Amino acid sequence: MHFFQSSLVAATMGAALVAAAPAADLETRGSCTFTSTSALKSGKASCSTITLQNIAVPAGETLDLTGLKTGTTVVFDGTTTFGYKEWEGPLISASGTSITIKQNPGAKIDCDGARWWDGKGGNGGKKKPKFFSAHKLNKSNITGLKVYNTPVHGFSIQSDHLTIKDVLLDNSAGTKLGHNTDAFDVGSSTYITIDGATVYNQDDCLAVNSGEHITFTNGYCNGGHGLSIGSVGGRSNNVVNDVTISNSQVINSQNGARIKTVYGATGSVTGVKFQDISLKGITKYGIVVQQDYENGKPTGKPTNGVKVSDITFEKVTGTVTSSATDIYILCGSGSCTNWTWSGNSVTGGKKSSSCKNVPAGASC
């Protein structure tokens, strides 16, 4: 028998009658509590509020929050865990319109990624499940989730008008063997806001590969690869427009503020603003724009098929390690134009002698 509770029915008829409720009553049912994925799958469509209570997701299964009724609220309660299997995931998938996803005080989502970590991430070794697919989660909110130790990528975002606020993604236990644990990957999306994220990971804190009207603000990023646009190029959608990344800290990471585009590809990066970004302990580049990525690696030879225009770097300040490079700009011929460069100060590392085609006003 599927287990779920309805506050509208159980309050007067008792839990024993819930499973036997006629179909007509299912449409009016309000608050439902689920303790298993099977009960969630069969009962979610009838609920306006869903509480997920200490769910242990079986190995190789997705916690399926897709196709929810418009206006549904989902509440994580207790500890959510996942069985072990080598597969691509996702561990959680959500879709719908005007959905709210949040958690009760003290709740957490524990992926126990150490079971998969082998230092190779998505590049070999064990096949690792991605964490959260937020595809077609439109006009919705994800608030206050506490997420620990994703096996590989965190939130995959492909939605419109989605706000993610005050989310913790803590992969600090993966410092040695965690890899490709990107926190927020954004693609083919519009009007995305990520506000107040706290991230400890081993890859990009934010990566915007395509999309428009995207805001990342009040973030704290520790241990990963920094705040990134790209890599842009070579995908079905190669347009990034109107992205603001502001009031954020990047600590003990490879890069601070980064734009990277693919060698030989076409596309555009326009209207991107990095504003009030604080850097500390950066180990590779404080500010970096590279147009030379091929097969995921830099070639040192930039191309100009992806236009990088109307870019603002304003008050990106802080320190890099002595072996790092303060600023590195490697643009294709004529492809980096109309930049605003103001109040930036990155110190502690080396000055690059390999910058090319630096746009007017910027310094390298």
UniProtKB/Swiss-Prot annotation:
SUPFAM superfamilies: Pectin lyase-like
InterPro entries in UniProt: Glyco_hydro_28 (IPR000743), Glycosyl_hydrlase_28 (IPR050434), PbH1 (IPR006626), Pectin_lyas_fold (IPR012334), Pectin_lyase_fold/virulence (IPR011050)
Residues listed as glycosylation sites in the UniProt record: 138, 141, 338
Active site: 203 (proton donor), 225
Gene (UniProt): pgaB
Enzyme class: hydrolase
Subcellular location: Secreted
Name of the molecule in the record: Probable endopolygalacturonase B
PROSITE patterns per record: POLYGALACTURONASE
Cell membrane listed as a keyword: no
EC id: 3.2.1.15
Keywords: Cell wall biogenesis/degradation, Disulfide bond, Glycoprotein, Glycosidase, Hydrolase, Repeat, Secreted, Signal, Zymogen
Xref: SMART domains: PbH1
One GO-annotated biological process of the protein: pectin catabolic process
Catalytic activity from the UniProt record: (1,4-alpha-D-galacturonosyl)n+m + H2O = (1,4-alpha-D-galacturonosyl)n + (1,4-alpha-D-galacturonosyl)m
Signal peptide: 1-20
